[in-house]
């Protein structure tokens, strides 16, 4: 998983294959990618209902495709995954309510863990 981890840590955005390719900001934490959707955050329609999604990471150097891989999708309990939610909040740029961000997510958004499948490089 070296290329995936390195790419996810270096780039602040990725592409998800949903109803159409969707750009999403994210955080890498504990071997997985975390994204937040809904409640005024980035719209990622249908992600939370999926079991799997294709993720494409781009190169921070030239913006080109670095690697694409399948990941399992799991909506996390935000209270039980507080460290991951904190890592994700730290990556949130230009939040209008940064002081109440985590509380707003808990009330109105879903935090989703994308775990690279074992066959991913």
What are these regions (language model features)?
Residues 1, 19-21, 73-75:
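Solvent-exposed, well-ordered amphipathic alpha-helical segments
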Residues 1, 40-41:
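Structural motif corresponding to alpha-helix initiation and N-cap regions
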Residues 1-14, 63:
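Extreme N-terminal tail/first-helix region
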Residues 3, 22, 56, 60, ...:
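Short, well-ordered helical secondary-structure segments
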Residues 4-5, 44-45, 85, 102:
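Short amphipathic alpha-helical segments and helix-helix/interface helices
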Residues 8, 12, 51, 89-93, ...:
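Generic secondary-structure transition motif, activating predominantly at the C-termini of alpha-helices
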Residues 9-39, 45-47, 53-57, 67-68:
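Short beta-strand segments
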Residues 62-121:
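Charged, gly/pro-rich active-site loop segments
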């Amino acid at each position: 998983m070296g290329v995936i981890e390195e790419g996810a840590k270096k780039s602040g955005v990725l592409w998800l294959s949903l109803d159409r390719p969707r750009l999403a900001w994210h955080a890498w934490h504990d071997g997985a990618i975390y994204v937040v959707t809904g409640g005024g955050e980035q719209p990622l329609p249908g992600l939370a209902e999926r079991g799997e999604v294709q993720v494409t990471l781009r190169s921070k150097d030239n913006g080109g495709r670095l690697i694409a891989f399948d990941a399992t999708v799991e909506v996390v309990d935000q209270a039980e995954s507080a460290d991951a939610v904190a890592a994700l909040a730290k990556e949130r740029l230009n939040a209008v309510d940064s002081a109440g961000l985590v509380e707003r997510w808990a009330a109105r958004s879903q935090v989703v863990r994308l775990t690279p499948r074992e066959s991913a490089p």
